[in-house]
Amino acid sequence: LFFLILFYPHLFGYLSTIFSESMFYYALLFFAESAVLYIYYYGWHWLQGGIRKWIHLGLGLSLNVVGTCLMLLANSWLTFMMSPAGVDAAGVFGGDTWAAMNNFLWHPINIHRFVANIAYGGSIVGAYAAFKFLTAGSQEERAHYDWMGYNANFIAICALLPLPFAGYYLAAEMYLYSQQMGITLMGGIFAWLFIIQAVLIGTLFLSANYYLWCGMGRSDGAKRYTKYIKYIAIVLVGAFLVWFTPHTLVLTNEELKALGGPHHKILGPLGIMPAKNTAVNVMIIFTALSFMFYRRANKVATVSWVNAGNAIQVALFTAGILNIMFLGIYHGYFTNTVYKVAASIPQVLTTVVVIVGSITLDSFIYKNSKEVAPLHWGRIPGRAMYALFLLAVAFTWLMGLMGYIRSGIRQHWHVLDIMRDGSVDAFTPTLGFAANVVSVAAIIFMAMVIFVFWIAQVSSNKTLPSGYWKE
């Protein structure tokens, strides 16, 4: 907000005439969030036990609610710049702030950022747990921060699985609002940034799965499922390679002549959206399968129909994957564009049915199950902690990249088709320059996070008074 006021005072002045009321509430909510955070943090020990623990829980929930409201208000300002509403063609405000807030892209980006922030929050907590685990001085501390890291990774995975769907929904709404904006997003210069995005999201999936596989070492019964890990890894890597395969290659004139065109004859078809939709759905399903194996690792089913239940689950996964492949291949390559685009919806529904159905059935199969042995918290290799670090770094870089794309598709407009950016810097930078700026921003943010970790470490160290000051 400070840089917006400093570098774009005219834009801020225009936005403040429209959103002055919401900006007032934004300031109030900011102070409310700070107050709740202080009480939550400094009342940590005071609010333990009895009725006070419920007050502590309520403060934590209130902190999340206030933070979400802040995000929703800020989202209304940025989406107004992309899909202005409540103003006439000349940009004159009609007086209805709610109409400006409730613009075409407000709800799609609310959903996308809400899910993304849950995943991102889990990754940051996981990174903190990894840091504390690696610096722990006792087995008890290692066990505690191992447990903390697992729960943080669980939250991140739960939000990561629906995140691609929320992103596709947002992109579809952008197309619906403005085809020019949609074409710029996926078919123009920004298309190559989505290749980088695919690499980052693939990194997230591989890191999350790797952590789960390492975490199976906590259980004495994990050896029953470790033999399947290599097959899951092969599928994930294969889907990852399909996901970031570009449709059009960046080539020199000599390479273009040698290849016979900008498209690779074999790999080119993997660069279009039907292949990528298929790949991401397969990655999501196999990530859910990894989590199911982790949950099962320390359990022994006691129900009489366990074999039948397992057979149903295998059939569900097999049928779901075959259906996703059929929809992606047949409708993606052998039908017209209408069916090609529409096929993504039943693919998503298939993925949801497979995951929800299999986990629901699994809960019944392992109801009243026996434990193989108590979980050995802290019995996890240190390299798994670096997977948690990678999750946090990749999420930070990804959020910076997608924020740039979201702003960049407005091109030379501050507010699309209303307020033009007439400055000398109103141009789309090269991909390399944009990537460097995002990298610097990610490094600065991660440095701030590391500083917070260090402050927390310093505040936990207590030194007994000695000498003159000792009482």
PLM region spans:
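Polytopic transmembrane helical bundles with strong interfacial aromatic enrichment
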Residues: 1-471
